[in-house]
Every structure is written in structure tokens, then in C-alpha cells.
Amino acid sequence: MTDKEKRLERQSRIRNFSIIAHIDHGKSTLADRILEKTAAITQREMKEQLLDSMDLERERGITIKLNSVQLKYKAKDGEEYIMHLIDTPGHVDFTYEVSRSLAACEGAILVVDAAQGIEAQTLANVYLALDNNLEILPIINKIDLPSAEPERVRGEIEDVIGLDASEAVLTSAKAGIGIEDILEQIVEKVPAPAGDPEAPLQALIFDSLYDAYRGVIAYIRIVEGTVKPGQKIKMMATGKEFEVLEVGVFTPKAMPTDELTVGDVGYLTAAIKNVGDTRVGDTITSAVNPAQEALPGYRKLNPMVYCGLYPIDTAKYNDLREALEKLELNDSSLQYEAETSQALGFGFRCGFLGMLHMEIIQERIEREFKIDLITTAPSVIYDVYMTDGEKIVVDNPSNLPDPQKIERIEEPYVKATMMVPNDYVGSVMELCQGKRGHFIDMQYLDANRVSIVYEIPLAEIVYEFFDQLKSNTKGYASFDYELIGYRPSTLVKMDIMLNGEKIDALSFIVHRDYAYERGKIIVDKLKELIPRQHFEVPIQAAIGQKIVARSTIKAMRKNVLAKCYGGDISRKRKLLEKQKEGKKRMKQVGSVEVPQEAFMAVLKMDDSTPKK
């Protein structure tokens, strides 16, 4: 057999697939079982959620990053198949990670919980898979639960998604039932990768990782051609050239190999020092014999939510910059730029995909880089049209121009799809109305579950929406959203003033109708959170020059009359007047420290949904 024939023969036995599911429907457990079944890992190494390698993922029990692993499986037809399993996150903020892993596969296993049925995210991920023309294999998991209703769920898959579920494997990943059937279905139904191992190299970078010793490690999927150590490669987006040092696959550990060819999913190192040189979604090609065009990459994802991150210890500003650079390498959807605030000093304005993403980045910086952070209230991106015809983009409330110069402000709207049990439809609709939502559609999926669609401003979803939705439905609702564009709204900027000074980090943009109530809530919250000073501190919420709410932190005062035994009123009055003078002087020079909780209070306005 020639080299080419060997490669083609091997290629016909490659199967690339990923697992998609709603949060908690059991995809990481299923991945564990598949690893066990194909003996990729020994019993000793087995731990729950093996592919979730970040501590944070294991603690929260969610998958954040995608992971890939190569497995060998001896099928019933006697052939040994090479499978690449790419584990994906299920949470709405990480849809991007999902779309990246799907671009590297030919098939997807769709895991549906036998008790809960189809959830909002299941649908979102299925549509992503269909966009990538993947072969989808439905699987009904958790059939060992007492509340499992596999037949109902089978019907649901057919009705709601329109997939043929007659051959859907009934499994229990926890008990290890039905795992072999899944592997056989993958062999039978998922197509082998197409491509020519002799063609010019085209490899898709679907993730990258920074290693202090080896520089950047790119995770790649070979679409055409072959790559070996010593070969000169070129990045198509940046035009930079490198020499390959090592290629290999993950079994979950990194294992160097002689070459990677069509259909392989593995990694490549090439002494790439600069993070910006390996863009996720870029195509790697050979420098000597380059491909004509790049692979259709991923869409560059735009952040939905922005917030300021400031180090509590200002000396750590450079450490924070390095931390963000390293995180950005693994997380192509994180964006940041330097900014300064009068209240908080130097920091960064960062863009995130959503609230969970924001929390996780914060937590990773605090854990992995040991930097304590202050975060400002998250805000979305507004399009501001000026009276002179100019359009500016505002992601930070303190940059909003003077109201006299603004013609209109447009804010992003999302289409939110919620799947809720029947009994909670009323409270969910009330929640959405309170969040300025427009009702679009409602469909009964079966006797117990309803899909509700609303159009809601993104700014309203950013604050606590998911938590409130969960608490209104006892945790049963699932939720997914997509951006549908910008619409004009009557929005105003609210400033918070302490002792007559604006605190820029506490400013936020709010709908005019809700401004008074939001202002009142924040002022009252700050009154509880800011410690009492030796002088009186007024807290005011203002729109432009107009004060809409005020609260006062009373001064702490010593009892100056304690020493005064005599009852002489003039003596007492003199002491009190003297104290008053002193307080007045302190007030002029005194500055007020704002604790971190106060910044968070602006975010957590849970009771702030005005009842209309």
C-alpha cells in the first residue's frame, strides 16, 4: 500500500463527533462512559467529568471550555475505528464554544433527558448542528430515573425538532447502559471525513492554549492535507509563518504523533510566542504549498455585556493586563481595553458573552492569578444618534454624551425563548412584561410544557433575569436568547452622587419610566452599605441636573455633653455648637470610601422590577 492509500484507508475509519445537550442532561457523564468503554483511560484515572479539566468547571458541574479526545473502538464488524470526541458546553453564554466544536465534526450526539424532555438550549444547539450539516443521532439519557418517560420524549424529539427518533438509543450514562449501541450508531451513521491527504494543508484552529514552556498550543482539525514536525506553516489570517515542532492527539493526555492527516483532531506547537498570532477560526496552511483560500471560519463573536474590572490593589494593574492576555488566548470571545475611573483608578473595560461568562472570567482571574477585583455594573452596547447626524457607540454609561446633543438612543433587543411548565406561564409572562418585554408567541409542546417567546431589551436580561426566571418557576424553566437588532428607547443616564460628588463607576443607563424607582432603590441600598462617617453624607440619584431620589447617612457623633454635669443650658449649647462647627469642616474636606458591596448593589437590583 502506498502512503496515500494507507492514509485514505485510515481516513475511512475516522469518526468525528461531539455531544450536544442542555445543561445537566448528562453529556459530561456520557463522555466519561464512552472514554471508559473505549479504554482510553484506566479505572485509576477515572474521575467524574474527566474532560472538565478546570477546577471551576468541576466545582460548578458545568462545562465551560470545549475539550477533545481521540478514542479507538473495535466495532462489531471487526474493524478498529478512530473516534474524536469533542465535548462542548451547554450553557447559553458559551454557544460560541459549541459552534466551534461543531465546525470540527461530522456528527453530533444529541442527549435529551428522559425525564425533562427537550429544553430551550437543546433546540438552540440542534439548530447550530443543522447549520453545520451534521448527522444528528438522538439519544434519550437517564432512563433509569423513576420519572423517566422515554416514549413521550421520543415523540417530543420528532414533533419539536423534526428528527426521526425511532432508532434513538435509550441509555443511562450513569449506570453505563446502552453505551455500546451509541458507539455502533456512530460507526454506522456518522460519515467519515472527506478530504484529500495529498492536497495543500488546510487546518482549522478551533481552540488554543498558552503553555509557559512551549508557547501557544493550537488545537486543530485537519480538513485537507497532512502536517508533520519540521514543516513550515503559515496562518492565513495574519500571514505569519512558523516551523512545526510537534503534532499530536489527546488521549485525554497530549500524545505526540508522527503526523496529523485529514480528519484528525489534535494539537500543534510551533514556538508561537504571541497570543495574537493564532486566532481561533483561522486556517493553518503550508508555507511552501499554500491553499488557495481559507476555510469558512467562525463568525467573530461580539460581546453582549461590558463591565469594568479594576484591581483592588492598584499596583497589580500590569498583572491584571497579563492575566487578561492569557485568558483571551483560551477565550477568543473575551475583549478588553484599558480605562480609568476617578473613583477606582486604572483598570480595564471588558466585553463578555453574558453574565455567566463574566462571573467565570472574574473568578478565574481571582483564582488563577490571585488578583482581587472590583467590578462595575455591567452594561450593554447602546447606539447613540447625535443631533448633528453622527452615530456613536457607547458601552460605558459614563461616556454617554450630553442629553441636549442626543437625538435618540437605540438599545439591543433579544428574542428570548423560554420553556416553562404549564403552571408557571402566568408568573413568567408577568416577569417578562415587567422587563419591558413584547409578547411574540406561545406554543404548547405537550400537556405540561409551554414554549413562550418574548422580545426583551438585552439590558433587562443582563440583570438577574435568569435567576428571577428560575425562582419564578421553581427552577423548571429553561431559557435561550439571540440578538435581533437595535430599537429606539427613551433611555436616560442616572448618576449617583455622594456628598455632592458624582461617582462615575456607579452611573447606569435606565429607561425613563423606571428611573425614579431604580434611583430610589439604589439610594436606599447604598445607605445601608456605606459605613457611617463622622459627618452627614447625602446620597442622591440624579438625571442631568434633576435629583430624583435622596437618602442621608446620619453622622456618628460623640456625646459631648457627657462631661457636663451642671445643668447650665448655655454651657451645653456651646459644646454642641462647637461639635457642629467641627462636623461642618470635616464635611468640606472629608471623602467617603465606597465598599465593593456598594458597586455590586447596583447590579443586584432584584427587587427593582417595577410592578406595572
UniProtKB/Swiss-Prot annotation:
Per its record, how is this protein called by name?
Elongation factor 4
Which HAMAP family does UniProt cross-reference here? LepA
Q: Which family does it belong to?
A: Belongs to the TRAFAC class translation factor GTPase superfamily. Classic translation factor GTPase family. LepA subfamily.
Where does the protein principally reside? membrane
Domain (tr-type G) ranges: 12-194
Give the E.C. number(s).
3.6.5.n1
Write out the GO MF terms.
GTP binding; GTPase activity; ribosome binding; translation elongation factor activity
Q: Any transmembrane segments, and where?
A: none
Q: Which reaction does it catalyse?
A: GTP + H2O = GDP + phosphate + H(+)
Asked whether the UniProt record includes Ribonucleoprotein among its keywords, one would answer no
User: PANTHER family recorded for this chain?
Assistant: TRANSLATION FACTOR GUF1 HOMOLOG, CHLOROPLASTIC, TRANSLATION FACTOR GUF1-RELATED
The record's subcellular location field reads: Cell membrane
Its GO CC terms are: plasma membrane
Keyword annotations from UniProtKB, A to Z:
Cell membrane, GTP-binding, Hydrolase, Membrane, Nucleotide-binding, Protein biosynthesis
Function per UniProt: Required for accurate and efficient protein synthesis under certain stress conditions. May act as a fidelity factor of the translation reaction, by catalyzing a one-codon backward translocation of tRNAs on improperly translocated ribosomes. Back-translocation proceeds from a post-translocation (POST) complex to a pre-translocation (PRE) complex, thus giving elongation factor G a second chance to translocate the tRNAs correctly. Binds to ribosomes in a GTP-dependent manner.
The membrane topology of this protein is: Peripheral membrane protein
Q: Which GO terms describe its biological process?
A: positive regulation of translation
PROSITE patterns (UniProt xref): G_TR_1, G_TR_2
Matches recorded under Pfam families: EFG_C, GTP_EFTU, GTP_EFTU_D2, LepA_C
Q: Which residues bind GTP?
A: D24, H25, G26, K27, S28, T29, N141, K142, I143, D144
